[in-house]
UniProtKB/Swiss-Prot annotation:
Known catalytic reactions: GTP + H2O = 7,8-dihydroneopterin 3'-triphosphate + formate + H(+)
EC number: 3.5.4.16
Binding site for Zn(2+): C85, H88, C156
Species per Swiss-Prot/TrEMBL record: Bacteroides thetaiotaomicron (strain ATCC 29148 / DSM 2079 / JCM 5827 / CCUG 10774 / NCTC 10582 / VPI-5482 / E50)
Example GO biological process: tetrahydrofolate biosynthetic process
Enzyme class: hydrolase
Gene Ontology CC, one term: cytoplasm
Ribonucleoprotein among keywords: no
Protein name, entry field: GTP cyclohydrolase 1
Family, per entry: Belongs to the GTP cyclohydrolase I family.
This protein's pathway: Cofactor biosynthesis; 7,8-dihydroneopterin triphosphate biosynthesis; 7,8-dihydroneopterin triphosphate from GTP: step 1/1
Pfam families: GTP_cyclohydroI
Length: 196
């Protein structure tokens, strides 16, 4: 999980002004008691929800890259995340499951979760986020293979449009050893049935 420090941005005042205008354009009184601080709250929330733009996920992995001869699958599963759909700026949220097969180097397990957090704290589409997580791990650790599966619920499908409240979207991407169906099957079995 990303640190919860206060977000400081030179754009805060301008964002507040725009959110004040949006509230007014929606037909509300931006000056009434319940909405007085809303522009500032929303501006700070948006800066927090998109702070991944100001973080380097490759550096996160490099900061805990260790030489190790372990060469079997490493899986970090059930990584909770939330993000904002870039089309409607509504949340989507779910779990990411990440596996890699080391090739002389491993990384701290928490760093995998941080990579997911960094890419999810941006305006996103689930498909691209899945690809970015995979590419970041592949490029930084150069493992024998990487596989990422992301399962999410999208508020843009639940609250508006088709209004399908129970739909779940699953995306996956993989490299190297995971091109073999047997290796992918092992990963899928472990994330579905391998509970502690």
């Amino acid at each position: 999980m990303l640190e919860k420090e206060e977000i400081v941005s030179p754009n805060l005042e301008e964002l507040k002004s725009h959110y004040h205008s949006i509230i007014t354009l929606l037909g509300e009184d931006a000056g009434r008691e319940g909405l007085l601080k809303t522009p500032e709250r929303v501006a700070k929330a948006m800066l927090s929800l998109t702070k991944g733009y100001h973080m380097d996920p490759h550096e996160v992995l490099r900061s805990a890259k260790f030489q190790e001869e372990y060469s079997q699958m490493v899986i970090v599963k059930d990584i909770d995340f939330f993000s904002l759909c870039e089309h409607h700026m509504l949340p989507f949220y779910g779990k990411a499951h990440v596996a890699y097969i080391p090739n002389g180097y491993i990384t701290g397990l928490s760093k995998i979760a941080r990579v997911v957090d960094i890419f999810s704290h941006r305006l996103q589409v689930q498909e691209r986020m899945t690809l970015q997580i995979k590419d970041c791990i592949q490029e930084t650790l150069n493992p024998l293979g990487v596989m990422v599966v992301v399962e999410a619920k999208h508020m843009c499908m639940q609250m508006r449009g088709v209004e399908k409240q129970n739909s779940i979207t699953t995306t996956s991407d993989f490299t190297g050893a995971f091109n073999q169906a047997k290796t992918r099957e092992e990963f899928m079995n472990l994330i579905q049935h391998g509970r502690v």
